[in-house]
């Protein structure tokens, strides 16, 4: 996983 969308 290159990044997490939970930051939005």
Swiss-Prot record:
Q: Report the superkingdom from the record.
A: Eukaryota
Keywords of the record, alphabetical order, are: Antibiotic, Antimicrobial
Q: In which tissues is it expressed?
A: Expressed in egg (at protein level).
GO terms classed as biological process: defense response to bacterium
Q: What does this protein do?
A: Has weak antibacterial activity against Gram-positive bacteria M.luteus A270 (MIC=47.2-94.5 uM), S.aureus ATCC 29213 (MIC=94.5-188.9 uM) and S.epidermidis ATCC 12228 (MIC=94.5-188.9 uM) as well as against Gram-negative bacterium S.marcescens ATCC 4112 (MIC=23.5-47.2 uM). Also active against yeast C.albicans MDM8 (MIC=94.5-188.9 uM). Has no activity against Gram-negative bacteria E.coli ATCC 25922, E.coli SBS363 and P.aeruginosa ATCC 27853 or against clinical isolates of C.albicans, C.krusei, C.glabrata, C.parapsilosis, C.tropicalis, C.guilliermondii or Trichosporon sp.
The note filed under miscellaneous reads: Possibly derived from Nedd4 E3 ubiquitin ligase.
Q: What is the protein name stated in its UniProt record?
A: Oligoventin
Q: Which organism is it from?
A: Phoneutria nigriventer (Brazilian armed spider)
């Amino acid at each position: 996983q290159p990044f997490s969308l939970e930051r939005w």
